[in-house]
Curated annotation (Swiss-Prot):
Family (UniProt): Belongs to the DEAD box helicase family. DDX51/DBP6 subfamily.
Enzyme class: hydrolase
InterPro entries: DEAD/DEAH_box_helicase_dom, Helicase_ATP-bd, Helicase_C-like, P-loop_NTPase
Domain note: The Q motif is unique to and characteristic of the DEAD box family of RNA helicases and controls ATP binding and hydrolysis.
Short motif (Q motif): ranges: 36-65
Protein name: DEAD-box ATP-dependent RNA helicase 1
Region entry Disordered, spans: 1-20, 495-521
Keyword presence, Nucleotide-binding: yes
Annotated Gene Ontology cellular component terms: nucleus
Helicase C-terminal domain: residues covered: 330-480
Record keywords: ATP-binding, Helicase, Hydrolase, Nucleotide-binding, RNA-binding
Residue numbers binding ATP: S85, P86, T87, G88, S89, G90, K91, T92
Source taxonomy: Eukaryota, Viridiplantae, Streptophyta, Embryophyta, Tracheophyta
Length: 521
């Protein structure tokens, strides 16, 4: 049953009647929970206290306490959990800690928990959290993110069969199936599908926990149909009447990956532990057609506050109104004001990021170090750039919304929207790179005069009507004009040269004349 309610569409479009699921109408209010010191968290395994302290955690945030009570506490994980909480509120530990605690008593190593995220960077960050707490209770954590070759991943995830080690032994007396080396796997959809399809011994048969992080993005993009595949493979065998996926195509999985019922596996008549799901986002979708893909069981929504969209409580929002042709100069002056503090600068496109980064290179003696962060760069280049930014070797990172999802940078105090975000969800994910884990932070947004009204209206959806106007000294902007004119000419020459090189190499190059017209925006 769904209830139709008059509301705005998910991305801030025109009003329409969008159906809402009944269980979303009465959420548990995360803000009603207080922080809890580590030593006072009920039923916490004592072995986990020291690892948490080494992580610098002295007290748990409300979202972590709420999730704990619904999984380890009275809730006992009887319902699937949906968490809608601002960026930087502590959602990763909110699911990692209960999963580690629940698996701490396992006797036999099997793949029991799967965490799926949209990007490699996010997955590696989540794995770091599990790595910090899981080993102390005897659990092994693996990753399948494409950081290394699939052969290397297989060697880290799967134990070779005894037949391979002792080929002369009679098959009747040895275990033929390769066994997993990990209890918990953090994966990206593409590499997960690779292992499901091709890796012998990779099985979801014993899976007890499935976490879908950044849920709205994971449901919006198909990602090789990973979700229906995982859902089908984790149903018990009496539920699997067909070997066809949603498109009617045959699935290429070994039979051992199908989850057998408890009776089949010798559980003395007891049902197999159900697959518990946790889905999380700072902007969780309310679309029933999307949520139905998850096949949630009696779901419980944990929501931060009454508003659907929330920004961190310690975030200060500012807007800067300027003409398009002065935006690059205004950005430089603002960055000078921030005095070399770490800062993320978001643009509307990869091309815009590249233009802006290239333009800044033609300004000499800037008092800050900057770098471009783009999907067009090699993965190794992006990784080195991000590491340099985290280590303080780079002050300013310029990129697109690829940087806006889940990436955590310690000590990041400032975010700048060089281009106005198109949707409130975009603003939340961008601004949420700062003011994390109870720290303070600031987000500046450059606006043209005609954008101000729409921007103010957008922020109201995020329960944020206090966005101050920030002014820059006009004389500081004017002093940069002579250099700006020279830099623009050099930029045009540089872009023309790049286009020529790409044309000769056969790469598809963006239209050079279009680049010229948009260099100031």
């Amino acid at each position: 049953m769904v209830v139709a309610m008059a509301t705005k569409e998910e991305e801030g479009g025109p009003s329409s009647r969008v159906p809402h699921l009944p269980w979303m109408r009465n959420p548990v209010d995360i803000d009603s929970f207080s922080g809890c010191p580590v030593a006072h968290l009920p039923r916490l395994d004592p072995r986990l206290v020291k690892p948490l302290q080494r992580m610098g955690i002295e007290s748990f945030f409300p979202v972590q306490v709420a999730a704990w009570l619904e999984t380890i506490g009275p809730g006992a994980f009887e319902r699937d959990i949906c968490i809608n909480s601002p960026t930087g509120s502590g959602k990763t530990l909110a699911y990692a800690l209960p999963i580690v605690q629940m698996l701490a008593t396992r006797k036999v190593r099997c793949l029991r928990a799967l965490v799926v995220l949209p990007t490699r960077d996010l997955a590696l960050q989540v794995k770091e959290v599990f790595d910090a707490i899981a080993p102390v209770v005897g659990l092994s954590v693996g990753s399948a993110v494409g950081q290394s070759s699939i052969a290397d991943e297989v060697s880290n995830l799967i134990e070779k069969s005894k037949q391979g080690l002792f080929p002369s032994l009679d098959e009747e007396y040895i275990q033929m199936e390769p066994q997993t080396k990990v209890d918990i796997l953090v994966a990206t959809p593409g590499r997960l599908m690779d292992h499901i399809s091709m890796t012998k011994g990779f099985s979801l048969e014993h899976l007890q926990y499935l976490v879908v992080d950044e849920t709205d993005r994971m449901l919006r993009e198909a990602y090789q149909s990973w979700l229906p595949t995982v859902i089908q493979l984790t149903r018990s065998s009496d539920q699997n009447h067909s070997w066809s996926d949603m498109n009617g195509e045959t699935l290429l999985h070994p039979l051992t990956t199908i989850r057998r019922s408890g009776v089949e596996r010798g559980f003395k008549g007891k049902s197999f532990p159900r697959l518990a799901k946790i889905v999380l986002s700072a902007t969780l979708t309310q679309d029933p057609s999307k949520l139905s893909q998850l096949e949630l069981q009696h779901p419980l929504l944990l929501n931060s506050g009454k508003k659907r969209y929330r920004i961190p409580t310690k975030l200060q929002s500012y807007k800067l109104v300027c003409k398009s042709n002065l935006k690059p100069l205004s950005l430089i002056v603002l960055l000078q004001e921030l005095r070399g503090e770490k800062c993320l600068v978001f643009t509307s496109s990869v091309e815009s990021s590249h233009r802006l980064s290239t333009l800044l290179e033609f300004f000499e003696d800037l008092p800050f170090k900057f770098s471009e962060y783009s999907r067009l760069q090699r993965e190794s280049t992006r990784r080195k750039t991000l590491d340099a930014f985290k280590e303080g070797k780079i002050d300013v990172l310029i990129g697109t919304d690829r940087m806006a999802r889940g990436i955590h940078i310690d000590g990041l105090r400032y975010v700048i929207n060089y281009d106005m975000p198109p949707y409130v969800k975009t603003y939340i994910h961008r601004a949420g790179r700062t003011a994390r884990a109870g720290e303070s932070g600031s987000c500046f947004t450059f606006l043209r005069k005609h954008e101000v009204k729409a921007f103010d209206k957008m922020l109201k959806k995020a329960d944020n009507s206090s966005c101050s106007l920030h002014s820059l000294p006009e004389e500081s902007v004017e002093t940069l004009r002579p250099v700006f004119s020279s830099a623009l000419k050099k930029l045009e020459e540089s872009l023309e040269s790049e286009a020529t090189k790409k044309s000769k190499s056969g790469d598809k190059a963006p239209n050079a004349s279009k680049r010229k017209r948009t260099i100031n925006t």
